[in-house]
A protein has these predicted regions:
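Helix-to-loop junctions at the C-terminal end of transmembrane segments
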Residues: 86, 184-198, 282
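Intracellular juxtamembrane helix-capping segments at the cytosolic ends
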Residues: 40-54, 158, 238-251
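A late C-terminal transmembrane helix in Major Facilitator Superfamily
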Residues: 254-285
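Hydrophobic core of transmembrane alpha-helices in multi-pass small-molecule transporters
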Residues: 24-42, 145, 225-238
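C-terminal ends and interior cores of transmembrane alpha-helices
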Residues: 7-22, 208-220
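Helix-loop boundary and gating motifs at the non-cytosolic
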Residues: 131-175
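Cytoplasmic helix-loop-helix junction between adjacent transmembrane helices
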Residues: 33-73
Length: 318
């Protein structure tokens, strides 16, 4: 954690000063790669702390739901802050603000009183593949990848739709509306008392994402699409909350941190893959095709979630 808190900000400083240091393109790419590779794993460690901190299932669900809502809030407010700084200042100022936030992340986390709940697992047997050797966790990771793949496609689809409608700024609005829907759904889910086991909730929550995504393919109205974006978001944060609950329940204590780390890997990997494929599809076939593939990916996630539902969950190791 300490290493990432130093290396990542330093790499970002090199990027910030690239022109003054006369860095080559290769050096700039290397600095960006290092910054990404050493990104502080604050979210991973936070979710691990939640696992240890909350024994009560209802409290743990609320914690993970709040985590999902805060992630949505960050993804919504971050671009807005950048846009404002770009409008009133310069790209350098916007990048500096991002750098400062990254630099503050590790100290703030390290000083958090929540760390007193952290548990070390000394002298335990570990396997090479760790959590990847557990079929229950692999099923959850597959759902995570497919859902985030769908969301990556969705973001590109919004950009393509807005560009085709000669309303390029509308893409950011659609993404923000979708995030608002997700945050609202996360808050509602966190406060709900549901008797249904979480593994059975997951396919149903994903279905709430699939249906409005499918409706994206048949509308050409920006305002109707905005309404569908809101509805499509409602199931996202609850679904991600359930994913984290399932990882928390299935991961042995010796692999708790690794399990959430791999979850983040599949999450980011799915999002990036969706962006990459979405860009190719939107150029050749348009936004509606991207929305269709996104709906298909979300449907695949819902079907994959049935395998998670049928497995008996292991208790959390203490």
């Amino acid at each position: 954690m300490l290493v990432t808190g130093i290396v990542c900000p330093v790499a970002l400083v090199f990027i910030l000063l690239a022109d003054r240091l006369a860095l080559s393109t290769a050096a700039l790419v290397a600095a960006a790669a290092i910054a990404g590779a050493f990104a502080p794993p604050v979210t991973v460690l936070t979710r691990t702390v939640w696992r240890y901190r909350f024994d009560d299932p209802a409290e743990r669900k609320t914690a993970f739901a709040l985590d999902a809502v805060l992630i949505e809030l960050a993804f919504t407010l971050g671009p807005v802050l950048v846009a404002v700084l770009l409008a009133v200042a310069s790209p350098r100022v916007a990048f500096t603000a991002a750098l400062l936030l990254v630099a503050l992340a590790v100290p703030v986390f390290a000083l958090s009183p929540a760390l007193k709940y952290w548990r070390h697992q000394p002298g335990v047997e570990r396997r090479l593949l760790g959590p990847l050797a557990d079929p229950r966790l692999l099923a959850v990771y597959a759902v995570t990848f497919l859902l985030m793949f769908a969301l990556g496609l969705l973001e590109i689809g919004y950009a393509g739709f807005a560009t085709a409608a000669a309303m390029p700024a509308f893409a950011g609005i659609l993404i923000a509306i979708n995030s608002i829907g997700s945050g609202t759904g996360g808050l509602l889910y966190g406060g709900a008392q549901l008797a249904m086991p979480v593994e059975r909730q997951l396919p149903r929550l994903l279905l709430l994402v699939v249906l409005p995504l499918a409706a994206h393919t048949v509308t050409g109205s920006p305002w109707l699409l905005a309404a569908l974006a809101l509805v499509a978001g409602i199931g996202i944060a609850p679904a991600l909350t359930v994913v984290m609950l399932l990882i928390s329940a299935n991961a042995p204590s010796r692999y708790a941190t690794e399990a959430f780390t791999w979850s983040t890997t599949f999450l980011v990997g799915g999002l990036g893959a969706g962006h990459a494929l979405g860009g190719r599809i939107v150029e050749g076939y348009g936004a509606r095709a991207v929305f269709g593939v996104a709906a298909g990916a979300a449907a695949a996630a819902a079907i994959s979630a049935l395998a998670v539902r049928q497995r008996k969950l292991a208790p959390v190791d203490r």
